[in-house]
Regions:
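A short, flexible loop at the N-terminus of ABC-type nucleotide-binding domains that lies
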Residues: 2-5, 14-27, 33, 57-62, ...
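Short catalytic/signature loops enriched in Gly
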Residues: 4, 21, 142-146, 236-283
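Conserved ABC ATPase "signature" region
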Residues: 75, 127-146, 254-255
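ABC ATPase NBD coupling module
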Residues: 76-93, 111, 119, 241-245
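A short, proline-enriched helix->beta-strand linker immediately N-terminal to the Walker B motif
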Residues: 170-174
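A short, surface-exposed alpha-helical micro-motif characterized by mixed small hydrophobic
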Residues: 218-220
Length: 283
């Protein structure tokens, strides 16, 4: 893989609780270049925790450790809050799951996107507005000037997620982390939004971490798939080779996918092996 932007080796995340420290992520390793990497697994497997760790978005109760956690020339483990503020949004951005919880309901859409740009760059307001209009056009919004002046409740869910994509990409980051960005959308709208995201990521040569539980989605959208179970990576495989997955957990997830062409009287139940909690993905 060319142009490695992000290097993660033995990332572990623990949270302090009343009952002691809880391991949420254990010894996760991967690299990311100009590609689309999916992180998949069931709820609670540690997918989002990995994504948030890269931006240091965890609460003070979290402890992040790693042998290597490097973004370009920056050691993220040693980076202070001032340095991280310069990275968040400008060089590495995160698209959240549901725009109705991410967008400010009392602030016009265009002003919110412009704010994401102006916090990192000094531009005249008029120039920033034109940049926002261009970005709304880039995410295939047909009437960008109307949407610019709209409030979040005046646009649809699919359009809201396009607005979030525009907001996260307008500062021209190097890496985008998309945390279940289409799970709140209808299937038809989901594919449209993913097509927009794919087009922009590819055209700009960005790295993408796509967090999802939908194996069918990542199979057609991503280059590589990293499968997590109970905070560990159990398998990393090319998306095109998912049907040849070797780990029983990955195969179990694939077997549980509904198949519209073949009726099954009973959906398979994934049988878990305690050894999965101790084994590590081969390096």
């Amino acid at each position: 893989m060319n142009d490695v932007k992000l290097e993660v080796e033995d990332l572990s995340v623990r949270f302090a609780t009343r009952d002691g420290m809880v391991d949420a992520v254990r010894n996760v390793s991967f690299t990311l270049g100009r590609e689309k990497l999916a992180i998949v697994g069931e709820s609670g497997s540690g997918k989002s925790t990995v994504g948030r760790s890269l931006l240091k978005l965890h609460p003070a109760s979290a402890r992040i450790d790693a042998r290597v956690l490097r973004f370009g020339d920056t050691d993220l483990l040693k980076a202070g809050e001032k340095e991280m503020r310069a990275i968040r949004g400008a060089r590495m951005s995160m698209i959240m799951q549901d725009p109705k919880y991410s967008l400010n309901p009392v602030m016009r859409v265009g002003d919110q996107i412009a704010e994401a740009l102006l916090v990192h760059r000094r531009l005249p307001r008029a120039e920033a507005k034109e940049r926002v209009i261009e970005m709304l056009e880039a995410v295939h919004i047909r009437d960008p000037r109307r949407v610019y002046d709209s409030y979040p409740h005046e646009i649809s869910g699919g359009m809201g997620q396009r607005v979030m994509i525009a907001m996260m990409l307008i500062p021209e980051p190097e890496i985008v982390i998309a945390d279940e960005p289409t799970s709140a959308l209808d299937v038809s709208v989901r594919l449209q939004v993913l097509a927009v995201l794919d087009e922009l990521i590819t055209a700009r040569g960005l790295g993408l971490i796509f967090i999802s539980h939908d194996l069918n989605l990542v199979r057609m959208f991503c280059d590589r798939v990293m499968v997590m179970y109970a905070g560990r990576v159990v398998e990393t495989i090319a998306a095109a080779d998912l049907d040849n997955a070797r780990h029983p957990y990955t195969r179990g997830l694939l077997a549980a996918l509904p198949d519209m062409d073949h009726r099954r009287p009973v959906l398979p139940v994934l049988k878990r092996d305690p050894l999965w909690l101790t084994s590590q993905e081969p390096r």
